[in-house]
From Swiss-Prot:
Residues engaged in binding substrate: 29-33, 78, 154, 209, 322
Protein's name according to its UniProt entry: Uroporphyrinogen decarboxylase
Family membership noted in the UniProt record: Belongs to the uroporphyrinogen decarboxylase family.
Pathway noted in the entry: Porphyrin-containing compound metabolism; protoporphyrin-IX biosynthesis; coproporphyrinogen-III from 5-aminolevulinate: step 4/4
Length: 353
């Protein structure tokens, strides 16, 4: 990507609720996944090897910008990246996901956890960001982190879970230890995100993949206070802050209360319905990624409906309701990106005339 190309700040403007010439679009898990170049790379390197080599990681991160024409890049990393450096023995296993050999079972386990020093512990993350921002991208780079609940659920369950029984039992039966764990993880997330911003990330998205397992009462009691602290500390960095979780539409109003800029929605809550619930901040979403496997006519119809709802305010970013599946045709994402740009640009021109 040539440095001489004009910087495309459409995503940043929309995140702040400002007027744009078209609706910005990017896709969760746009980096890697379905791209043939990425698959070829994965034949030789594993996830950890790619993420630890800045040149390779930068290549994977910028591929969708070059191929799809999206308005933002998101760093190619895993939410588990910082955990080993605070003392969590985690391994990413093919076909399973993150596996932790010694799950958290007590306050004593939490007390053993250390602190993250990003420049010392994850220099490869920061070098990747600097490489992208200084030399390769003409769009904003989104940094990210996992959220305390999701990270804690892996640490307590020992890996992926369908019901998070152990996590919820721990939360309710040992509330003081739970708060200690939330605070430890929040400290890590804050310094990790700030380091990404200092290296050049222009926005931060916090992924709470599994928080939809909680009801609103539990979220407000056990999670919301620590999320408020995280976003309050990060807001001083003056970059857009985004919140997203899967199956967590019932928590969208609580996210809106937090000191953040963008509320990410999955496909379960329509944008009009979110607005009726009082969400006035920028909304990001929310095409069901499953539809990317459907014929183009189906995708176009649904994308148009989402755009018509989202464009009722300036604060709208088009995205999926979750990540890109590996079997999605890259040409579909390229076509969808062009459609979002063209349809929204024409509609905005019409609205202003």
């Amino acid at each position: 990507m040539s440095k001489r190309e004009a910087f495309n700040d459409t995503f940043l403007k929309a995140a702040r609720g400002e007027k744009t010439n078209h609706v910005p679009v990017w896709y969760m898990r746009q980096a890697g996944r379905s791209q043939p170049e990425y698959r070829k790379l994965k034949e030789k390197y594993g996830l950890v090897e790619i993420t630890h080599q800045p040149e390779l990681c930068a290549y994977v991160t910028r591929l969708p910008v070059e191929q799809y024409g999206v308005d933002a890049a998101i760093l190619y990393k895993d939410i588990m990246t910082p955990l080993p450096y605070i003392g969590v023995d985690v391994e990413i296993k093919n076909g399973i996901g993150p596996v932790i050999d010694q799950p958290v079972r007590s306050a004593a386990d939490i007390e053993k956890l250390g602190e993250l020093n990003p420049e010392q512990d994850v220099p490869y993350v920061l070098e990747t960001i600097r490489l992208l921002v200084n030399e390769q991208l003409n769009v904003p780079l989104i940094g990210f982190s996992g959220a305390p609940f999701t990270l804690a659920s892996y640490m307590i369950e020992g890996g992926p879970s369908k019901n998070y029984n152990k996590t919820k039992a721990f939360m309710h039966s040992m509330p003081q230890a739970w708060k200690m764990l939330m605070d430890k993880l929040a400290d890590m997330i804050i310094v990790y995100a700030k380091a990404q911003i200092n290296a050049g990330a222009k926005a931060i998205q916090i992924f709470d993949s599994w928080v939809g397992a909680l009801n609103r009462e539990d979220y407000r009691q056990f999670i919301k206070p620590v999320m408020d602290r995280i976003f309050r500390e990060l807001s001083a960095e003056q970059v857009p802050l985004i919140m997203f979780g899967v199956g967590a539409s019932h928590l969208a109003g609580d996210w809106h209360d937090l000191p953040l800029d963008v509320v990410g929605l999955d496909w379960r809550l329509g944008i009009d319905d979110a607005r009726k619930q009082g969400i006035t901040k920028t909304v990001q979403g929310n095409l069901d990624p499953s539809l990317l496997l459907a014929p183009w006519e189906v995708i176009e119809k649904k994308a148009k409906a989402i755009l018509d709802q989202g464009m009722k305010t300036d604060g709208f970013i088009f995205n999926l309701g979750h990540g890109v599946f590996p079997d999605v045709n890259p040409e579909t994402l390229k076509k969808l990106t062009a459609f979002v740009h063209e349809y929204s640009a024409a509609k905005k021109t019409e609205q202003s005339s």
